[in-house]
């Protein structure tokens, strides 16, 4: 079954200093990202360095709750597709969910 995670990509900072929150879907070792309508600012995130790479964690609980709710909706929709969805590739899953 596909896995879902919400995240912010450090290299995709907008000119106004905000970042778009994305949902990463992984299936059979391949990932795709779905853009959401939610953006976070510097006050909503924590930046860290991990092995020289910048990582961003969302700390705004309201955004976290919204993203978890969105992921739950995606999981429910994917489950409703039946067991055949387990054999879909990530492109087919994203197409189905969006």
Segments the model singles out, each with a brief description of its role:
Residues 14-18, 27-98:
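N-terminal helical hairpins
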Residues 1-22:
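Short, charged/polar N-terminal "headpieces" of proteins
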